[in-house]
Amino acid sequence: MMRFTKFYAPSLKEAPKDASLPSHIFLTRAGFVEQIGSGLYNFLPLGKRVLDKIKNIVKEEMDKAGAQEVNLSFITPASLWQESGRYNVFGKELLRFKDRKENEFVLGPTHEEAMLSLVKNKITSYKQLPLHLYQIGLKFRDEARPRFGLLRCREFLMKDGYSFHANEEDLGREFELMYKTYSQILQRMGLDFRAVEADSGAIGGSGSKEFMVLAKNGEDDILICENCDYAANIEAAKRAKKTCQDERPEANYASKFHTPNIKTIDSLAQFFKTNAFYTIKAVVKKAIYENESKLVVFFIRGSDDLQEVKAQNACSALELVDASEEELEKAGLVAGFIGFVGLKDIDFYIDFELENEKQMIMGANEKDYHLIGIDVVNLNKDRFKDLIEVKEGDCCVKCGAKLKQSKGIEVGHIFKLGQKYSKAMNANFLDENGKSQPFYMGCYGIGVSRLLAVAIEASHDEKGCIWNKTLAPFVLEIIVSNIKDEKTLEFANKLYEDLTELGLEVLLDDRNERFGVKMNDFELMGFPYALVIGKGLENNEIEFIQREGLVKELIKTDELTEILKKKVL
């Protein structure tokens, strides 16, 4: 019997000082998790029950999709990461260490290399493909600033799966299967989510989709079409090409105008009495690479803003940082007056929406001068990249309807890795013609421990957690208002046994505490339903409480089973 007096759920009156999000506040106060260090958490019985439910749903759906579960070592030899080329690319988030024999290892934040090593030289023929292996295990990412509780911690539980294919077409089939599988997982958990176009980040590859649970405290900005199914992370969002009805500025090609102290787009547009849409903005960044750094200039429409993740991908940098005034001066760049005409010895990229644009205004690479009448033509195609940040109100790239911005929390990510890792690690198989070919790979991750926090970010009130029936540690709590009343306690015990036999997960609050304390704990812990056994029992009545909205009603004891079957089971 699950009695509160025997159940370990140490609650706190106050939230941790660094807790700002509801999930962090309520999960620690209610005794689901306990923080033991920066970004490190213990899962207590309540949290472990939810975690197990999440894991079971993930496992059931992955197994149904034909994936096979394995369990890889938490520690990976550094040589595998060096072989793939990711050892230096991943940055300081990858925790590196040596054993007593000076052998180098890493704590795996992902396991592409380890999983590829597992099948390398064992899967040797196309006849053994496709193969999909997954695990649910610990990961470690040495975050610089762990925060927001389970949403950004250093050690976390993750489901990561990897598929191996003979060709790109079969990889596409598996990608679509995982899209459906992940959607089913999140639907079963009762979460409001969107699958969005995404950047591949340090993992690499193409064909990337993130699964975002909508929540007002979400750390990611996502754009959702009001009409069709298009949705994208702001880092990867695309739009229908913008147009402007205002007249273009008139001038001969590359006419040079004296524009004293005109350094901003607004002042430039005002000076030429035109729309900023017809100006070209230069954004200078210092691109950091493995063994060097250099200045890169990104040219975008004056009415747009640079999307830094897109810009970083365009120049294949590990990181972009702001360039200093000294660095600009050393490179011969004049801040506020930079243009691509005559720009020498500096890498530059142009937003692809500017290709073939006519009669534009741009810096002349000379202090206090701009060029007007610039045609963006006859340039190397490789210069044109998707660089701009798409915003709310822009038009959908698929159907042309308006895009709406929302907040989301990433809980899953699926990638088409292609042959990136298999080529780097020389992992091959023999195709139908007996020719050696690198595997085509897919990668599929779900943040299992993160989902526990996400569920509460998406469903809570000012009093505490609000769990749905699928994820709740207990579906129903029986609250005995006066534990010293033998008749009440006897009825509660019998009710507990009857409901357990019906298959309900029930917690019996038999503590010798004030009724107000018990109710506060119920509201904080957030079980979907409660039955209060109190004075009403004299009239054969019990109070039924629904946690969402704290809806209360009195029900007769002889109607209890039927009502619970309708509302709870």
UniProtKB/Swiss-Prot annotation:
Cysteine pairings via disulfide bonds: none
Alphabetized HAMAP family for the sequence: Pro_tRNA_synth_type1
Major subcellular site: cytoplasm
Organism the protein comes from: Campylobacter jejuni subsp. doylei (strain ATCC BAA-1458 / RM4099 / 269.97)
Cellular component annotations (GO), alphabetically ordered: cytosol
Organism placement in taxonomy: Bacteria, Pseudomonadati, Campylobacterota, Epsilonproteobacteria, Campylobacterales
Gene designation: proS
Name of the protein in its database record: Proline--tRNA ligase
InterPro entries xrefs: aa-tRNA-synt_IIb (IPR002314), aa-tRNA-synth_II (IPR006195), aa-tRNA-synth_II/BPL/LPL (IPR045864), Anticodon-bd (IPR004154), Anticodon-bd_dom_sf (IPR036621), Pro-tRNA-ligase_IIa (IPR002316), Pro-tRNA-synth_IIa_bac-type (IPR004500), Pro-tRNA-Synthase_IIa_type1 (IPR023717)
A GO molecular-function descriptor: ATP binding
Keywords, in A-Z order: Aminoacyl-tRNA synthetase, ATP-binding, Cytoplasm, Ligase, Nucleotide-binding, Protein biosynthesis
